[in-house]
């Protein structure tokens, strides 16, 4: 897959000292294609006919929306395989908990993507409902696959583009450096082109402390990396994306 054109980088914001979100476990929380387009700097039109994987996709509507735009999208998540009722309950529980935290810690958020918390919640809940409707129809057609990092159930180079949002770095307190390294290598393994990971900060909005070391070790393994500033920031510090590709690819 040819590298996608990068627009000029916007100004970066500075992290602020605030109490982090309480994330004792990975939340089942998702976003829309429009939000993915901004946080990953994607042009959906350019992706038509491409094979795209959304890793740790949760209840994001990206795959449903992308498929409607003739993008060959697949989503993978450890909770896929659960019944529709089970996932619906999980969405209700995790969304209620997450938005209660979001409203309680307004200094952790920026209103660049949404004008206010109500708009953000409405958009995210609409994305989840679209996911649930698509999951009910297409789970058995392998659009939604059960799997988890750092071991994905796909052959080498299956996808032109691999995306992973709000898992790596955000849950650094839960997953150690070795897990992050293994996860990055696995994402690259299943990609024939690029990997894009967003964001590069933790639940406190601070940059991932091990990023420089991670990039060095990936380079030693033949994986090139680039930090891409993006025109997106909902969570403070979430204004950059990591792009990975095999060197000379």
Positions of PLM-derived features:
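Class I SAM-dependent methyltransferase Rossmann-like catalytic core
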Residues: 2-49, 61, 68-69, 81-92, ...
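Class I SAM-dependent methyltransferase "Motif I" SAM/SAH-binding loop
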Residues: 53-60, 66
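Class I S-adenosyl-L-methionine-dependent methyltransferase module
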Residues: 68, 72-142
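Conserved SAM-binding strand-loop segment of SAM-dependent methyltransferases
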Residues: 140-151
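A short acidic, Gly/Pro-enriched loop at the edge of an enzyme's catalytic core
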Residues: 150-163
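Residues lining the SAM
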Residues: 165-169
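A short glycine-rich, Lys/Arg-flanked "PGG" loop and its adjoining helix->strand segment in the class I
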Residues: 177-193
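Class I S-adenosyl-L-methionine
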Residues: 203-249
């Amino acid at each position: 897959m040819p590298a996608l054109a990068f627009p000029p980088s916007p100004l970066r914001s500075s992290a602020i000292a605030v109490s982090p979100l309480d994330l004792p476990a990975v939340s089942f929380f998702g976003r829309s294609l429009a939000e993915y387009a901004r946080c990953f700097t994607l042009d959906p039109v350019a992706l038509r006919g491409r094979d795209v994987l959304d890793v740790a996709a949760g209840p994001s509507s990206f795959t449903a929306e992308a498929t409607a735009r003739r993008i060959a999208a697949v989503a993978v998540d450890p909770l896929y395989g659960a019944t529709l009722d089970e996932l619906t309950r999980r969405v209700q529980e995790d969304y209620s908990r997450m938005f209660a935290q979001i409203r309680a810690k307004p200094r952790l958020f920026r209103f660049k993507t949404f004008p206010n918390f109500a708009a953000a919640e409405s958009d995210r809940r609409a994305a989840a409902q679209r996911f649930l409707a698509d999951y009910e129809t297409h789970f058995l057609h392998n659009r939604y696959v059960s799997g988890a990092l750092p071991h994905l159930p796909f052959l080498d180079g299956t996808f032109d583009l691999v995306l992973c949002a709000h898992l790596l770095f955000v849950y650094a307190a839960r997953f150690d450096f070795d897990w992050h390294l293994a996860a990055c290598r696995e994402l690259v393994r299943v990609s024939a082109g690029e990997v894009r990971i967003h964001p590069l900060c933790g639940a406190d909005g601070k940059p991932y402390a091990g990023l420089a070391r991670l990039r060095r070790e990936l380079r030693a393994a033949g994986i090139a990396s680039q930090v891409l500033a993006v025109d997106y920031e909902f969570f403070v510090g979430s204004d950059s994306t990591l792009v990975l590709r095999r060197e000379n690819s």
